[in-house]
């Protein structure tokens, strides 16, 4: 039976703005309070989805969240009609309104951790929504994330869904941005690679000093248990705390893996040799041949990696076994990074081609190609059980671009977030979107 890696990309929501909400994310902080263009952001994301679909890759779409999140503001003490809640928040606590309007759910690499059926004890695909408890604006995402994933992957014969881990710092979980799976074939048992920034309970592990480590070892271990993964199929590694302090807030900013290949920066991990040996040994026992490509700091610095998002790329396997790297335009703008990529593809190695995409609206908030997608490895029968409304096709692309053109503003500033009309625009758009994607009622305004 054939198996596929399906990339489900996050559709950018109508309230995409530069709120500067993500401490430790250099791009998010440095572009704070600039004017944004939600329409352009959504169309840039859709263009990437269409391009991958046309290249022959399986591509899906993940719906955005309801924003402003009026229920979240009510939980913080604002009362009255929805319009009054928004106006009160704007007057009394603008940062809370900005947080409740964040379109950060577009970065669906943080939506959940996914384990394919070949790895799990019960032979189903397992999903655990990430609690994202490190940042308030993201911690409010997981209830809707769970409902959307449940509507996309509804068949309980094939799919199992777990609630987010306890929303406390000890179980800080950032989802697939700190998780990669290595395998010989997507349908065969593989090795799941969990990367953490600190341990909550074991003081022997070092931690960053400047920026927070968002993923704990204990959270990764809990997800592996929930998914029924075997010890032989799991490797845990610690991200280098010094790179977290340089703006590497998720592992997908400093490494990317796919199939049998890990592409990583020399400074990405602690105890790298031990980690590589464990990956090689465990994948070898599952019939795979683990290979790694290390980018030396002498050629690309950590700062270059963070500015260009070289590693926040998509590493994709072509039918002929060669690999393709999808990178943001910013890689071409960095001389050292671009020079490295040219030498990489001309060396006759595993990565043969680089494709560049303009994702500037997302990049200015600190999210590149890898942030925008959630990978789900599916067997043919499982893919057939996915809600067909969320699988990208040429007609769906056309419908979604028209939908964006109809509902999205082309300019949004912080003061616009206080406009109650924006809430109505967003709800109207999302109500239509759930019909387009055949999701049913998943948003609070549709349920309550």
UniProtKB/Swiss-Prot annotation:
One of its GO terms (molecular function) is N-succinylarginine dihydrolase activity. It catalyses: N(2)-succinyl-L-arginine + 2 H2O + 2 H(+) = N(2)-succinyl-L-ornithine + 2 NH4(+) + CO2. The keyword Hydrolase applies. Coiled coil: none annotated. The active site is at 174, 250, 371 (nucleophile). Signal peptide: none annotated. Catalyzes the hydrolysis of N(2)-succinylarginine into N(2)-succinylornithine, ammonia and CO(2). This is N-succinylarginine dihydrolase. The gene is astB.
């Amino acid at each position: 039976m054939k198996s596929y890696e399906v990339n489900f990309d996050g559709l950018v929501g109508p309230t995409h703005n530069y709120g500067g909400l993500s401490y430790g994310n250099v791009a998010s902080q440095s572009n704070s309070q600039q004017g944004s263009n939600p329409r352009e952001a959504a169309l840039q994301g859709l263009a990437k989805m269409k391009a991958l679909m046309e290249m022959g890759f399986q591509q899906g779409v993940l719906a955005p969240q309801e924003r402003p999140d009026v229920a979240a503001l009510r939980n913080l003490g604002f009362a009255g009609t929805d319009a009054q809640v928004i106006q009160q928040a704007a007057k009394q606590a603008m940062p809370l309104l900005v947080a409740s309007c964040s379109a950060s759910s577009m970065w669906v690499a943080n939506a959940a951790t996914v384990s394919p059926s070949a790895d799990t004890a019960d032979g189903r695909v397992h999903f655990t929504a990430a609690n994202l408890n490190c940042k308030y604006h993201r911690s409010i995402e997981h209830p809707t994330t769970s409902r959307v994933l449940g509507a996309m992957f509804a068949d309980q014969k094939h799919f199992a869904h777990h609630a987010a881990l306890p929303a406390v710092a000890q179980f800080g979980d950032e989802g697939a941005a700190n998780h990669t799976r290595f395998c010989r074939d997507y349908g065969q048992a593989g090795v799941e690679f969990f990367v953490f920034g600190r341990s909550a309970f074991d003081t022997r592990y070092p931690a960053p000093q400047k920026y927070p480590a968002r993923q704990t070892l204990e959270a990764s271990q809990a997800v592996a248990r929930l998914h029924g993964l075997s010890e032989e199929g799991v490797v845990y590694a610690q991200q280098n705390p010094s790179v977290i302090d340089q703006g590497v807030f998720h592992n997908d900013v400093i490494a990317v893996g796919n199939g049998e290949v890990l592409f990583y920066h020399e400074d990405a991990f602690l105890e790298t040799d031990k980690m590589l040996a464990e990956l090689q040994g465990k994948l070898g026992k599952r019939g795979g041949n683990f290979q790694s490509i290390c980018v030396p700091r002498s050629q690309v610095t950590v700062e270059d990696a963070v500015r260009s998002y070289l590693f926040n790329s998509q590493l994709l396997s072509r039918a002929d076994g060669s690999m393709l790297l999808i990178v943001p335009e910013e890689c071409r703008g960095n001389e050292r990074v671009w020079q490295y990529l040219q030498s990489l593809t001309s060396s006759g190695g595993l990565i043969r081609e680089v494709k560049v995409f303009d994702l500037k609206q997302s990049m200015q908030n600190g999210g590149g190609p890898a942030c925008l997608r959630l990978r789900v490895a599916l067997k043919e029968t499982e893919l057939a059980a996915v809600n067909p409304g969320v699988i990208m096709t040429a007609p769906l692309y056309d419908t979604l671009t028209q939908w964006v053109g109809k509902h999205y503003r082309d300019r949004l500033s912080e003061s616009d977030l206080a406009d109650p009309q924006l809430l109505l625009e967003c709800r109207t758009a999302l109500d239509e979107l759930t019909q387009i994607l055949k999701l049913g009622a998943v948003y609070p305004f549709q349920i309550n």
